[in-house]
UniProtKB/Swiss-Prot annotation:
The chain crosses the membrane at residues 28-48, 51-71, 101-121, 124-144, 159-179, 220-240, 242-262, 274-294. Its main location: membrane. Coiled coil: none annotated. Belongs to the UbiA prenyltransferase family. This is 4-hydroxybenzoate octaprenyltransferase. InterPro entries: HB_polyprenyltransferase-like, Prenyltransferase, UbiA_prenyltransferase, UbiA_prenylTrfase_CS, UbiA_sf. GO terms for biological process: ubiquinone biosynthetic process. It comes from Paracidovorax citrulli (strain AAC00-1) (Acidovorax citrulli). Pfam families: UbiA.
């Protein structure tokens, strides 16, 4: 006699849940953080920075972004259950407890700090405010009308750290690169916020998409153009030649493509624009690498 008990799908392992927690299958997030960090590392070193620093900043970027996901999901768990896109995240659904998520985040942050300890005192010092901003960002969405600016600071901390790791100090050049990167984060994370705008309005979440209102698309385009212009201006003295010029042209074409994706403000178009942003960062990084190699 066959059992009539309903079939239950196999439950995911703890490892699978932790990988989902840190968005392991969705690398676009850490790539957005990685490309400007590596670009700054190449600029600071005047070319290839060596395998040690390349490994430290690549692994550190992935680890800290993953730790940030843990903190973010704990902080947003009561909001995420009301948003279609985030309702099934491990912490929100109860598959991973708050204590577990914070534990995973702490381990990842400690491993990342261990990597920083192999650099120098200045870089270690800069890692502390970097950690503080990473923790603060999820809570900024409750109080700041443009929390994407706080994320922009968090996602730009690798730039001064790259300069201190190479030269022990942060030149004025790094400030211009940070400002440009901040504009880029404002552009792509506003696209991201446009995806969830209807849900965020219902639950009282503050985002740049809500703050900008009907000016969101022009503002995103202005942020993109400011990003390209600031990095082009900062890189001009290095004489990177045709690779940089070609890359800047390619970046402007990508910006135009983003306008086509978001101009009607559809969820699908805005999300596609956001997830495709890592190609913009990779394009810039590739131009910088080629420019220094051929200089």
């Amino acid at each position: 006699m066959q059992s009539t008990a309903p079939h239950r799908p196999p439950q995911p392992s703890r490892l699978a849940l932790y990988l989902d927690l840190i968005r392991w299958s969705r690398p676009a997030g850490w790539l957005l953080l990685l490309w400007p960090t590596l670009s700054a590392l190449w600029i600071a070193a005047g070319g290839f920075p060596g395998w040690h620093l390349l490994a430290v900043f690549t692994l550190g970027t992935i680890l800290m972004r993953s730790a940030g996901c843990c903190v973010n999901d704990v902080a947003d768990r009561d909001f995420d259950r009301h948003v279609k896109r985030t309702a099934q995240r491990p912490v929100t659904s109860g598959a991973v407890s708050v204590r577990e998520a914070l534990g995973v985040g702490a381990v990842l942050a400690l491993v990342s700090f261990g990597l920083v300890l192999t650099t120098n005192a200045a870089t270690i010092a800069w890692s502390l405010p970097a950690l503080a901003v990473t923790i603060a960002y999820p809570f900024a969405k409750r109080f700041v009308s443009m929390p994407q600016a706080v994320l922009g600071v968090a996602f730009s901390m690798g730039i001064p750290m790259a300069f201190t790791a190479v030269g022990g100090a942060v030149p004025m050049l790094a400030a211009w690169l940070v400002l440009g990167n901040l504009c880029w984060v404002l552009a792509y994370d506003t696209e991201y916020a446009m995806v969830d705008r209807d849900d965020d309005l219902k639950i009282g979440m503050k985002t740049s998409a809500i703050t900008l209102g009907r000016h969101d698309v022009p503002a995103v385009m202005a942020f993109y153009l400011a990003f390209v212009a600031l990095w082009a201006w900062a890189l001009a003295p290095f004489g990177l030649g045709w690779p940089l010029h070609a890359v800047l042209a390619a970046m402007l074409l990508q910006v135009a493509w983003h306008w086509r994706l978001i101009r009607h403000r559809t969820r699908e178009g805005c999300f596609r624009a956001f997830t495709g942003n890592h190609w913009l960062g990779f394009t810039l990084f590739a131009g910088i690498v080629a420019g220094f190699a051929l200089r």
